[in-house]
Amino acid sequence: MALKERIGTVVSDKMDKTVVVAVINRYPHPTYKKIVSRTTRYKAHDPENTCVLGDRVKIRETRPLSAHKRWAIEEILNKTSQAKEVKK
């Protein structure tokens, strides 16, 4: 069985070792044939906390890692120049 892969944008990096990735799926409406965009948000495992808000990433399907996490970051395609703030 082949593992599923998706390409999306990181929309949240507030959790430890987890990011939320928004994937936009475009498809024609079955009746009206208009191109419809649907956004799906996946929680993905980021073990080194390397992803920041706005990064374009590739995620792959994996075993369940928690109650909601079934995807893992495979690679960062486009890195944003946004630096993380250090909390004191």
Swiss-Prot record:
Domain of life: Bacteria
SUPFAM superfamilies named in the record: Nucleic acid-binding proteins
Keywords: Ribonucleoprotein, Ribosomal protein, RNA-binding, rRNA-binding
InterPro entries, per database record: NA-bd_OB-fold, Ribosomal_uS17, Ribosomal_uS17_bact/chlr, Ribosomal_uS17_CS
GO biological-process terms attached to the record: translation
Function: One of the primary rRNA binding proteins, it binds specifically to the 5'-end of 16S ribosomal RNA.
Family of this protein: Belongs to the universal ribosomal protein uS17 family.
Name under which the protein is recorded: Small ribosomal subunit protein uS17
Originating species: Prochlorococcus marinus (strain MIT 9301)
Gene (name only): rpsQ
